[in-house]
C-alpha cells in the first residue's frame, strides 16, 4: 500500500508525467534489446501502436484499382504515399472492413472441408450442455491425453506421405502409401479438395490435425477423452469445476473405447481355450472395429490398457515398461530388488509360495479413481501416500499396496482357504489369490495392520482402519493426500515377450501383465465390432452361435464338401464347431455324434446319396466325440431361446429351414445364406433310391431287361425286380421292398451288397 501511495503522489506532479512521456529512450542496451534480430520482442505493444497509426498496413499497388479511395462514410482507405523501402501502398484498417463487405466473393465450398476439425468443434460446443459450477478442491493428476478430437490414427510418417500426395501431388520424392487407411484417406481428400483455392500450406496444417493423434501431458480431474480435453479450460480450475456434457462424439474416442472392449473380450475368451496365445492372435487378426482391421488399429493406437497391451505384446509390438497389479499401473521411480521364492504361512496355515522382492523400492501407483506413492523394503511397507475420489477408491488403493508389500501381517490376516480360479478353472497365482481375498473383505487386514500417531503435515491427513479420516492417528505408514500422483509421463516403449498363457514379461523376466489383470467391466462398444473368429460367436448368446455355425459352413461349402468326402475326421475336429457343442444337451452329444457320423459314412459308401442340405444341417452334431450305439433319431435337440428346440433329421423346422424354391437357408428365422446344391442332386444316382426302399439282389440279370434310369425305377411296383445302372457304369439287380422299412438298415445292407454285386 505504501508504494502505491508513493506512486500516486509522484504521478500527481506534472513534472513526473512530463519526464515519462517526453524523455527519449536512448539507453543503448534498451535500444539494442528492441531492435536487434528479426523477432518481434513485444508483439502486443507493437500491434497496439501500429493500429493507432492511420495506415498501418501495406498492400500491393493493384489494390488502388480494386478499392475506392474513400468508403461510404468518406473515410480515407489508402494513402497515395508509398511505403518507405518498397513499392507497396499504405492502407487503413478500414480498407479491410470494406474488402470484407464489398470485395469479390469466392467459393466457400471448401472451407468446411479444410477446416473440418474446427467446424465440428463448433457443432460439439453448440450442442454441448454446461451444468452448474461447483467450488471444491480439485485432485488433478497429469495424464497423457489426446488433445485433438476427430483424428485418424496415422503415424507422423504415414500422415506426411498422405499430405504430400494430397496437397503437393507433383512434388518430387518417394511416397509409399501402403496401409488401407492411407489409401482411403488420400482418395477421399483428393476428391473433396478438387479446385480448392485455400493456401496449400494451410490445407497441409489442417490435414495434419485430422490425421495424427496429438497428445499432451496435462493435469486432469475427470473425463480424459478428447471431447472433454478440448474444453478443459472451461471445466476445471484450481478450486472449481463446471459440469459439461459434450455435444457429440468423435471417432477417435469411439475407436479407443471399442478397442478396449474388443481386447478385453478377446483376452477373456482366449484364456479358456486350449492354446490361449494362438487363439488370441487368431481372434485379433480376424476382428474388425468400425470396419478397420483390429491389428491395424493396435499398430497405430497408443491406448494403454491391460487387455490392449496383452494383444500388442502378442503381435510383437512394444508396450510401456510399467506393470499392472490389482488394476493399478505401477512404475518404479527408484531403488531396485532381486526376486527370491519364499514359502509363507497364511492365518489359516495354508502354505503359499510367493516371489519376494528383496530391496528398497519406490513406486507410483495410478488407477482410474485413485493414485498413490509407495515406498517399500523387503516384505515391509514403509510409506503409502494415497489420494482418490472417494473413500471406496482410496480403500482399493490401500488394499492393493498392502498386498503388494507382501508384509507378514497381511498374509496372517487371511482367514479360510485361498482357492480362487480364473475363467479356465486354473488356480490363480498366490499374489492374486491374496488380492482377491482382501478385495472381497479387507476388514481383518486393516484391523491387523496397526495404527500410529501422526504429525500435522500440510495437505496430509490420517486414515483409520474403518476408512474414516483422522488428524491424530492413521494406519501404519499410510497417509491420505489432497494432491494426486501424476501418471508416468514417458511414452517410452520396451520390447516384451509373451508366453502361451498370455503372461507378458520384460527382458529381465519381470511379469508386466497377465490375464488376471484384465478388467471384468462390461461395456457397450460405440463402434461395431465384428468378430469373424468362431471363438467369439458365443459372445452374443446361443442364437448367434447357431446362425454363425451354419453361415460358416455355407460360406466355406466348397472346401467343407471335399473334406466331408475325403477327410471327415479333420472336418469334425474343426474349431468352428466347438461353440455349437454348448448348445447340444450334454447327455445326448455323444449319441447324436455317433448317429450322424454313421449316417454320413453310409452316404459316402453309397455313391450318389449326397444330400447337401442334410449334410449341412447335421454336420455340427458330428463334432463331439462319438458314442457307438444303435440309437436312431428323427430329430436332434438344441438349447436355444431358453428351451430345447428340435432340428428334424429329414425335413424343415423353425430352427433349420431350407426353402427349395429360393435355395436359401434360414436359421431361427434369420437368413443364413444361399445354398448351391450339386447339379446331379435332384436326380441323384440310383443309390439314393437303393437307400430308400430297395433291396439289392446281386449282379445284373439280363432276364429283367435293359438297365433302367432312376426315374423309371420309381414306377416299379412293390416286390418288382429290375436292373439298375449305378455309379461308375455298373449294373445291379434290385427289388422294390414290399414294405417301407428302416432307411438306415437299407443303406447299411445296400453298401455291402453293392460291393459284393460289383465284385
From Swiss-Prot:
Organism: Influenza A virus (strain A/Teal/China/2978.1/2002 H5N1 genotype W)
Site feature Avian adaptation, where: 627
Ranges that cross the membrane: none
UniProt KW Nucleus keyword: no
Pfam families linked: Flu_PB2_1st, Flu_PB2_2nd, Flu_PB2_3rd, Flu_PB2_4th, Flu_PB2_5th, Flu_PB2_6th, Flu_PB2_7th
GO molecular function, one term: RNA binding
Cellular component, GO annotation: host cell nucleus; virion component
Gene3D superfamilies per UniProt: Polymerase Basic Protein 2, C-terminal domain
Motif (Nuclear localization signal): 736-739
The family this protein is said to belong to: Belongs to the influenza viruses PB2 family.
Subcellular location, record wording: Virion; Host nucleus
Function: Plays an essential role in transcription initiation and cap-stealing mechanism, in which cellular capped pre-mRNAs are used to generate primers for viral transcription. Recognizes and binds the 7-methylguanosine-containing cap of the target pre-RNA which is subsequently cleaved after 10-13 nucleotides by the viral protein PA. Plays a role in the initiation of the viral genome replication and modulates the activity of the ribonucleoprotein (RNP) complex.
Cited InterPro entries: Flu_PB2_2nd, Flu_PB2_6th, Flu_PB2_C, Flu_PB2_CAP-bd, Flu_PB2_middle, Flu_PB2_N, INV_PB2, PB2_helical
Record text on subunit structure and interactions: Influenza RNA polymerase is composed of three subunits: PB1, PB2 and PA. Interacts (via N-terminus) with PB1 (via C-terminus). Interacts with nucleoprotein NP (via N-terminus).
GO biological process: 7-methylguanosine mRNA capping; cap snatching; DNA-templated transcription; symbiont-mediated suppression of host gene expression; symbiont-mediated suppression of host mRNA transcription via inhibition of RNA polymerase II activity; viral RNA genome replication
UniProt keyword annotations, A-Z: Cap snatching, Eukaryotic host gene expression shutoff by virus, Eukaryotic host transcription shutoff by virus, Host gene expression shutoff by virus, Host nucleus, Host-virus interaction, Inhibition of host RNA polymerase II by virus, mRNA capping, mRNA processing, Viral transcription, Virion
The UniProt record lists the keyword Ribonucleoprotein: no
Protein name: Polymerase basic protein 2
Major localization class: virion
Amino acid at each position: 500500500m505504501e508504494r502505491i501511495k508513493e506512486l500516486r503522489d509522484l504521478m500527481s506532479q506534472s513534472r513526473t508525467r512530463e519526464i515519462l512521456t517526453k524523455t527519449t529512450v536512448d539507453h543503448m542496451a534498451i535500444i539494442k534489446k528492441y531492435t536487434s534480430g528479426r523477432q518481434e520482442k513485444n508483439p502486443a505493444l507493437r500491434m497496439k501502436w501500429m493500429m493507432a497509426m492511420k495506415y498501418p498496413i501495406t498492400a500491393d499497388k493493384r489494390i488502388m484499382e480494386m478499392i475506392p479511395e474513400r468508403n461510404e462514410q468518406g473515410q480515407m482507405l489508402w494513402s497515395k504515399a508509398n511505403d518507405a523501402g518498397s513499392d507497396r501502398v499504405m492502407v487503413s484498417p478500414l480498407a479491410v472492413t470494406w474488402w470484407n463487405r464489398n470485395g469479390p466473393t469466392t467459393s466457400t465450398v471448401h472451407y468446411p472441408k479444410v477446416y473440418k476439425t474446427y467446424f465440428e468443434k463448433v457443432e460439439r460446443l453448440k450442442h454441448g450442455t454446461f451444468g452448474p459450477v461447483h467450488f471444491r478442491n480439485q485432485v488433478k493428476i497429469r495424464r497423457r491425453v489426446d488433445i485433438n478430437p476427430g483424428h485418424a490414427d496415422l503415424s507422423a510418417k504415414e500422415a506426411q506421405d498422405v499430405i504430400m500426395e494430397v496437397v503437393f501431388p507433383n512434388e518430387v520424392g518417394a511416397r509409399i502409401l501402403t496401409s488401407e487407411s492411407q489409401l482411403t484417406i488420400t482418395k477421399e481428400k483428393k476428391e473433396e479438395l478438387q479446385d480448392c483455392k485455400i493456401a496449400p500450406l494451410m490445407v497441409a496444417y489442417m490435414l495434419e490435425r485430422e490425421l495424427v493423434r496429438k497428445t499432451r501431458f496435462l493435469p486432469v480431474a475427470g473425463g480424459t477423452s478428447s471431447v472433454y480435453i478440448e474444453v478443459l479450460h472451461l471445466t476445471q480450475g484450481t478450486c472449481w469445476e463446471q459440469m459439461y456434457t459434450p455435444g457429440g462424439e468423435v471417432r477417435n474416442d469411439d475407436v479407443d473405447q471399442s478397442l478396449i472392449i474388443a481386447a478385453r473380450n478377446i483376452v477373456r475368451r482366449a484364456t479358456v481355450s486350449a492354446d490361449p496365445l494362438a487363439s488370441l492372435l487368431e481372434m485379433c487378426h480376424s476382428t474388425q472395429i468400425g470396419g478397420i482391421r483390429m491389428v491395424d488399429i493396435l499398430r497405430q493406437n497408443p491406448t494403454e490398457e491391460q487387455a490392449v497391451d496383452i494383444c500388442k505384446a502378442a503381435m510383437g509390438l512394444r508396450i510401456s515398461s510399467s506393470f499392472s497389479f490389482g488394476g493399478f499401473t505401477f512404475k518404479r521411480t527408484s531403488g531396485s530388488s532381486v526376486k527370491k521364492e519364499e514359502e509363507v504361512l497364511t492365518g489359516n496355515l495354508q502354505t503359499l509360495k510367493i516371489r519376494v522382492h528383496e530391496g528398497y523400492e519406490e513406486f507410483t501407483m495410478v488407477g482410474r479413481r485413485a493414485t498413490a506413492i509407495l515406498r517399500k523394503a523387503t516384505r515391509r511397507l514403509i510409506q503409502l501416500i494415497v489420494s482418490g475420489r472417494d473413500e471406496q477408491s482410496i480403500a482399493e488403493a490401500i488394499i492393493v499396496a498392502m498386498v503388494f508389500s507382501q508384509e507378514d501381517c497381511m498374509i496372517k490376516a487371511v482367514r479360510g482357504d485361498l482357492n480362487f480360479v480364473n475363467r479356465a478353472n486354473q488356480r490363480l497365482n498366490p499374489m492374486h489369490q491374496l488380492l482377491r481375498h482382501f478385495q472381497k473383505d479387507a476388514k481383518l487386514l486393516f484391523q491387523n495392520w496397526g495404527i500410529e500417531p501422526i504429525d500435522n503435515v500440510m495437505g496430509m491427513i490420517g486414515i483409520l482402519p474403518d476408512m474414516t479420516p483422522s488428524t491424530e492417528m492413521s494406519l501404519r505408514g499410510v497417509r491420505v493426500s489432497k494432491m494426486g500422483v501424476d501418471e508416468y509421463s514417458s511414452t517410452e516403449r520396451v520390447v516384451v515377450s509373451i508366453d502361451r498363457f498370455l503372461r507378458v514379461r520384460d527382458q529381465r523376466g519381470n511379469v508386466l501383465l497377465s490375464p488376471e489383470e484384465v478388467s471384468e467391466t462390461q461395456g457397450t462398444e460405440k463402434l461395431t465390432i465384428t468378430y469373424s473368429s468362431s471363438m467369439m460367436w458365443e459372445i452374443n448368446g446361443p442364437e448367434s452361435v447357431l446362425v454363425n455355425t451354419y453361415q460358416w459352413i455355407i460360406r466355406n461349402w466348397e472346401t467343407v464338401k471335399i473334406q466331408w468326402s475325403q477327410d471327415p475326421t479333420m472336418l469334425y475336429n474343426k474349431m468352428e464347431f466347438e461353440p455349437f457343442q454348448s448348445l447340444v444337451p450334454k447327455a445326448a452329444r455323444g449319441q447324436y455324434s455317433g448317429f450322424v457320423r454313421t449316417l454320413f459314412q453310409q452316404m459316402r459308401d453309397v455313391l450318389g446319396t449326397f444330400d447337401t442340405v442334410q449334410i449341412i444341417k447335421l454336420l455340427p452334431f458330428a463334432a463331439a466325440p462319438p458314442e457307438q450305439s444303435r440309437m436312431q433319431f428323427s430329430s436332434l435337440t438344441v438349447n436355444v431361446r431358453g428351451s430345447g428346440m428340435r432340428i428334424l433329421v429329414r425335413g424343415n423346422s423353425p430352427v433349420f429351414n431350407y426353402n427349395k424354391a429360393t435355395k436359401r437357408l434360414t436359421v431361427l428365422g434369420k437368413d443364413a445364406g444361399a445354398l448351391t446344391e450339386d447339379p446331379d442332386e435332384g436326380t441323384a444316382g440310383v443309390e439314393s433310391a437303393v437307400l430308400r426302399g430297395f433291396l439289392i439282389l446281386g449282379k445284373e440279370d439280363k432276364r429283367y431287361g435293359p438297365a433302367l434310369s432312376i426315374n423309371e425305377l420309381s414306377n416299379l411296383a412293390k416286390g418288382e425286380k429290375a436292373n439298375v445302372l449305378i455309379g461308375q457304369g455298373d449294373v445291379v439287380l434290385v427289388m422294390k421292398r414290399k414294405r417301407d422299412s428302416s432307411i438306415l438298415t437299407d443303406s447299411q445292407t445296400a453298401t455291402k451288397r453293392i460291393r459284393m454285386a460289383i465284385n
